[in-house]
A protein has these predicted regions:
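Active-site loop ensemble at the mouth of alpha/beta enzyme cores that anchors a bound cofactor
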Residues: 49-61, 163-180
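Extended, hydrophobic alpha-helical segments in both membrane/secreted and soluble proteins
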Residues: 130-133, 146, 210, 224
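Ferredoxin-type iron-sulfur electron-transfer modules in oxidoreductases and energy-metabolism complexes
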Residues: 5-23, 166-295
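Short, conserved aromatic-histidine micro-motifs
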Residues: 60-87, 146, 151, 155, ...
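Hydrophobic alpha-helical positions that pack around
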Residues: 3-126, 138
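Terminal amphipathic helices with adjacent charged low-complexity linkers/tails
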Residues: 2-7, 29, 142-176, 272
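Short amphipathic, charge-patterned alpha-helical segments
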Residues: 126-144
């Protein structure tokens, strides 16, 4: 509704439509609402959806800038990117770049959720320590529990342990410790979080959202979900943990888009960093967290 009203106001005041401000230039803006498919966050999947087809990502090249919507050159940008354009135009690129680090300039929207006192979306300079985001802005861990793990950039990125939260939140620094800044979606987990349950929930999501176009993704996400469900239910064997890692390894880099990698990276990092919890589930057929919280 906000975007719709903004477009209507622009037409009303002559900033859109025919002969804009008497310049002879015409421009119309249309708003199309998607159905919420995760795969349509991939730019070519989005274009396919806009054309009325299945939201299946395209092989690239050609890239949208040369052949996009209906074969025409198309600019596809995230809202966060477009929102940064206005202050850059107003104050200049040097000013914007000075807000971050020398190699990662500007600000980033960090959407903090999970077991924190003040969940929310915070616009902060690139390079701010993850610890500061959690404790200074999000108020620390809810009920003053201990921190266990943090997803630094959305559900698809490798997880970080409590010992890694002094990392600076920019692309280079997060990559240097084996994760990704991704979308800036910070998910905080306290000491009572069952990591098996957390990973199972993520794997269910990716199995549901896979478009099914590529076999490694379609079959891989399904097998990850099924195997993790067995681990959580206490019906798995120890070798199933290595089987999960094998599936994840063979999914990465083998598909048209990055959804397979998005499903595989969490599996590899959760098992590598919290393998003892997965082994406990297999051996004792229950969770070693006494009062596992909802995740």
């Amino acid at each position: 509704m906000i975007l719709k009203k903004a477009i209507e106001d622009a037409y009303k005041h002559g900033y859109l439509g025919k002969n804009i401000l008497g310049t002879g230039y015409n421009l119309d803006v249309y708003l199309h609402r998607g159905a919420g498919a995760y795969i349509c966050g991939e730019e070519t999947g989005l274009l396919e959806s806009l054309e009325g087809k299945k939201g299946w990502p395209r092989l690239k090249p050609p890239f949208p800038a040369t052949s996009g919507l209906y074969g025409c050159p198309t600019c596809v940008n995230n809202v966060e990117t477009l929102a940064a354009v206005v202050p850059i135009i107003q104050k200049g690129g040097d000013w914007y770049a000075s807000l971050g680090t020398p190699k990662n300039g500007g600000t980033r929207l960090f959407c903090v959720s999970g077991h924190v006192k003040r969940p929310g979306t915070y616009e902060l300079p690139m390079g701010i320590p993850l610890r500061s985001i959690i404790y200074d802005y999000a108020g620390g861990i809810k009920d003053d529990r201990k921190l266990k793990a943090v997803i630094p950039g959305g559900s698809s990125v490798p997880i970080l342990t409590a010992d890694e939260i002094d990392v600076k939140m920019d692309f280079d620094s997060v990559a240097a410790i084996g994760s990704l800044l991704g979308s800036g979606g910070v998910v905080v987990m306290n000491e009572d979080t069952c990591m098996v349950k957390a990973l199972l929930r993520i794997s269910k999501f990716y199995a549901h959202e896979s478009c099914g176009q590529c076999t490694p993704c379609r079959e891989g996400t399904t097998w990850l979900k099924k195997t993790l469900q067995r681990v959580y239910d206490g019906d798995a064997r120890q070798e199933d943990l290595d089987h999960l890692l094998g599936i994840a390894f063979n999914m990465m880099g083998t598909t048209i888009c990055a959804l397979a990698d998005a499903a595989a990276m969490p599996v590899r990092s959760y098992i590598q960093k919290f393998r003892h919890e997965f082994e406990y589930h297999v051996k004792h057929k229950c969770c070693d967290v006494e009062a596992a919280v909802r995740v």
